[in-house]
Amino acid sequence: MKIGFSVKFNKAKYPSKKKLIGKYCFLEPVNAKKHAKDLYKNFSLDKKGIDWTYMPTGPYKTFSSFKKYLTTDKLSGNPFFYSIYSKRLKTYCGLASYLRIKPEIGTIEVGWITYAKNLQRTV
């Protein structure tokens, strides 16, 4: 049984590695030199490491181990990670990524969402 009309599909574009600007925050491709200090400071607000419970990485006990994580090639391809900057807090306080990026079939997922305590439950 045919449902609807056939759709002509052209290969989708790979996501741009540009800054994504929103009303309350912006996302930038992860840059360890620029973002690591803020991110580590803000993620360290979670003293028990609870925010990392369902993540396959972290929590990070030292700044150097966290910065090393941010510099891995795993964060710049597929998945592709962004640092989240809160305009209200004026600091980088989260991570998010695109993953399972398949332009040839037009699919993409969002994941690895990690908000520091000071970003959780905010607008």
Task: Cite the ranges covered by each PLM segment.
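GNAT-family acyltransferases
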Residues: M1-V123
